[in-house]
Structure formats: C-alpha cells, structure tokens
C-alpha cells in the first residue's frame, strides 16, 4: 500500500511540475480613445476595459495604477527622492539625478495627473477612491471565477514636465511627448493576490492583453511606439505602403489608430520634428526608428537599424524568437526605457539593452518589483553576449558587471537580491544588484552547468514561460531539468 501511495504522490508531483507553465493568468483588452491638446498638454480619454477573471477567486474589488499622480509636490515619489538626497555615497547624494528635488518645485501647469470622471462595470456605476497613484474600486457586484466583465471609464490627464520616464519637453532631447504609463492601468492579480504597488519611480508589472488605441493629436505631430498602425495610408509620415499617395483628412488633427496583441503595456511618443526611418529585417519584421538630431547625429541614430539587423539572428538563436511584426526605437525625453514592441531612448547608446528587454520584460514578464534582477540582470547578460558578437570580441564580456559588484561588496551597502525593488535602502545598491549581480547570476550558472547547457536552459526557459510571468523558482526548475543538476543551493546562496 505504501508503495502505491508513494507512486501516486510521485505522479501527482510530476503532473504538477509539468503543468506549472499553464498557471492561470488574468486577461485584459483595452479600447481607448484619446484627444490630446498640445497647447495645454492635457488630454481627454475614454477607456473600455474587458477583464477576464481566470482565477478560482471571487473578486470584490479591483485596483488601477494612476502613474501620472506621482509627479506632484508631496507625493510618495517626491518624498522618497528627497530622502535619498540626504543619503550620501562619499559626497554624492543617492538620489536619481533625473529626479532630485524637481517634483516639489513643479508648478500647477507642470504637474502630472490622472482624474477619473466616471467608472462603470457592466453599465453600473462603481464607487472608487484615489490614493495618489492607486485607484481602489469596491465593486457593487463581485467578479466570479472564470467570468468576464466590462469596465467603462472616462478620464482626463495632464502630461507632467519630463522628470522620469513619462513626460514632456526635455530640454536636452527636445522631444515633446514621451507617453509611458499615461493611462489608468489595471493592476495585476495573480497567484499571490493583488499587486497595487504605489509608483515611486521604479518597476512595473502588468496584465497580458490586447490594446486598441486611437490618439487624436495635432496633424503636424509624428508618432511612434507600441503596436501596429492601422491607418498608415491615411497618416503617412513614412508609415504608408510603398507607392501610396497619402491623402490626409481635413482639419487640424489626425487620429492615429494602433493595435497591439498580447502585450502588457502601451507606450507612444510624439513630436512634430521626428525623422522616421525603417528597415525590413525579414518578411514579417520591420524596424522603425524615430529620432531628432538635437543631441546625437543622424549617422549614430541610423546605425541602430543596421546593427539591430545584424544582431537579430544571433539574438533569436541564443535567446528565442521575436514574435511581433515590428519594433520601434524612439527618441524620447528619458531613457533608455523599455516597453512592449518599442523603447524610448534619450540617445542612441542604450538601444541594445533596451531592445533586449523585450525578451525578459516584454515576453517573459517577470514581476519586476519582486525580481528586478531577473529583468535588468538577465537583459544585461544578454547585452554582454550580443555586444561581444557585434564587436567580434574574444575577451570576458561580463568584466564590467564583476567590477561593479565587487565595488558594491566593498562599500558595505549590499542588500539581498530578494529585496523588493522599492525597498532598497539606496539607489546604488538597487542598481548594482539588479543589473550587475543579476548578470553575474547567469554568467556563473554557465560555470556550474557548462556554457552550452546554460544556453539550452535559457532557450527552454523562454519556450516554457513566454507570456506567463515566471518567478525565480520557475527558472530554477527549468535549469535543473535541462542540466540534470540540483541547483537550489545556487539560488539560496546567490539570491
């Protein structure tokens, strides 16, 4: 009898392990219509959000992110930055130099905000309350397991002066609008529960879904970002099909219509002076580049396209296939910063790192707050490998990460990799842990398993967990299966 029970238990455990990549996930579909006023830097928005509760839980409330509200004097993001400014590394303040004390000095027409004007679920008005960057909605009727509801929202927003990631009018790049985290975004609900994480300028975590976005804006503006432009032959600006003579609608505005399938965020940027170039990397993939020559030459910008084309076969062979039909490198007010199918770049130098984020942030989608090193570190590792390929270099590609990590250890400021991204005591410790120590995690894994096996692990991890929000235990489980080695000790010692 004991033998039968043990056999049954073993079968159940094996079945559970094999089924792990099919872990349930919520699903969303956004349909949004935006009307932008480039004189006031404000926009009106309508959002229809179809929400699938694929969990076995009954949901009595939901949460939205309202990221723009962080850019107001006295916000949590403002207070955190001021606190970090009082922490010194030598004589250098620990604050992000892009943020510093700038939020507290914003004028009323320079702050960011997102105001909810109305919200219904299945046509019934819902009570809600704002707490800075989080909107809590206590539902009048619960969302049952395995059911779908529809939220309709009317909102208005003001684009903040460029400080961090999203914003307007960076004086160096002179890009007018860098529109990330610009819409009320449903928080993620997963096997751990809700993740209504206040925004203090760090990481993101989103629900997989489809986006249908229409943006009405001054007809002189050129847009780039996430998604496929649906009305390219009416818009023009280099998006139109070859040979098409564009006939733009009459009036002072154009409506740009984008769709983006199976992504967890949507970014766009806009400027009247963008130069738009594109390169067909293969039959089903086009690279777009939108830039200005305000802080870098056209030659340095356009080299991105040829280098990306050269790197693509190596990247896909080593880390997995890129599944979308386009990728856009977009000059922005802050960056590099990664988004699905696109990146914002303040200059051409960070293009490779930000593009490679689309494998780890974009397609694997680990919770960046809990595991920032599995995004930044794995991306840094991939960047080291790809840059060595592009440079035809034979040296040790991870040297920079090792040097940075050694410096952190010697400083006495190292914190465990298990620290939540928002809870590191210093920005310095967070940065080195997330980028350098995460990079070294994969480099040393190759020392343990052998480089060829480590590469097989990365491809199998991508194959099994693409679009499924994996965590570190999921990665270790794949690594153990592929290598036929016990690796929990490595996770425990290093993480």
Model-found features: residue ranges?
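A surface-exposed beta-strand-loop module
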Residues: 52, 92-172
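Glycine/proline-rich low-complexity spacer/linker segments in large multi-domain proteins
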Residues: 76-89, 156-211
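Amphipathic alpha-helical substructures
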Residues: 431-495
């Amino acid at each position: 009898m004991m033998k039968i029970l043990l056999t049954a238990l073993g079968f159940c455990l094996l079945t559970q392990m094999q089924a792990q990549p099919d872990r349930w996930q919520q699903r969303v579909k956004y349909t949004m219509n935006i009307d932008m006023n480039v004189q006031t830097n404000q926009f009106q928005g309508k959002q229809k959000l179809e929400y699938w509760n694929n969990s076995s839980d009954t949901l009595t409330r939901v949460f939205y992110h309202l990221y723009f509200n962080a850019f107001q004097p006295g916000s949590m993001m403002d207070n955190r930055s001021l606190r970090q400014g009082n922490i010194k590394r030598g004589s250098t303040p620990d604050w992000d130099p892009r943020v510093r004390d700038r939020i507290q000095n914003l004028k009323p027409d320079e702050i960011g905000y997102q105001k909810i004007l109305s919200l219904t679920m299945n046509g019934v008005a819902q009570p809600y309350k704002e707490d800075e960057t989080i909107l809590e909605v206590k539902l009048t009727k619960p969302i049952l397991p395995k059911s779908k509801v529809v939220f309709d929202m009317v909102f208005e927003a003001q684009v903040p002066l460029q400080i961090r990631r999203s914003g307007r009018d960076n004086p160096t790049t002179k890009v007018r609008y860098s529109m990330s985290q610009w819409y009320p975004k449903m928080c993620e609900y997963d096997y751990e529960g809700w993740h209504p994480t206040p925004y203090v300028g760090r990481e993101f975590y989103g629900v997989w879904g489809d986006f249908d976005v229409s943006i009405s804006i001054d007809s002189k503006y050129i847009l780039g970002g996430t998604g496929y432009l649906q009305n390219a032959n009416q818009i023009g600006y280099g998006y139109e099909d070859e040979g098409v003579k564009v006939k733009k609608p009459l009036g002072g505005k154009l409506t740009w219509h984008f769709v983006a399938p199976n992504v967890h965020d949507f970014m766009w940027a806009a400027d009247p002076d963008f130069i738009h170039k594109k390169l067909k990397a293969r039959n089903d993939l086009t690279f777009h580049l939108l830039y200005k020559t305000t802080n870098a030459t056209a030659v340095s910008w356009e080299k991105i396209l040829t280098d990306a084309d050269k790197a693509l076969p190596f990247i896909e062979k080593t880390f997995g296939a890129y599944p979308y039909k386009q990728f856009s490198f977009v000059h922005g007010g802050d960056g590099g910063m990664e988004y699905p199918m696109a990146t914002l770049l303040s200059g051409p130098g960070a293009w490779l790192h930000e593009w490679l984020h689309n494998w780890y942030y974009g397609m694997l989608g680990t919770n960046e707050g809990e595991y920032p090193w599995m995004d930044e570190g794995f991306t840094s590792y991939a960047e080291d490998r790809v840059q060595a390929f592009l440079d035809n270099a034979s040296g040790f590609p991870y040297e920079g990460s090792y040097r940075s990590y050694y410096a952190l250890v010697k400083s006495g400021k190292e914190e465990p990799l298990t620290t939540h991204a928002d809870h590191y005591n210093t920005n310095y410790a967070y940065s080195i842990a997330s980028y350098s120590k995460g990079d070294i995690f994969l480099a040393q894994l190759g020392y343990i398993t052998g480089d060829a096996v480590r590469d097989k692990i990365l491809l199998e991890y991508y194959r099994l967990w693409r679009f499924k929000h994996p965590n570190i235990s999921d990665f270790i489980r794949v690594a153990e299966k592929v290598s036929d080695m016990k690796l929990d000790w490595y996770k425990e010692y290093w993480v």
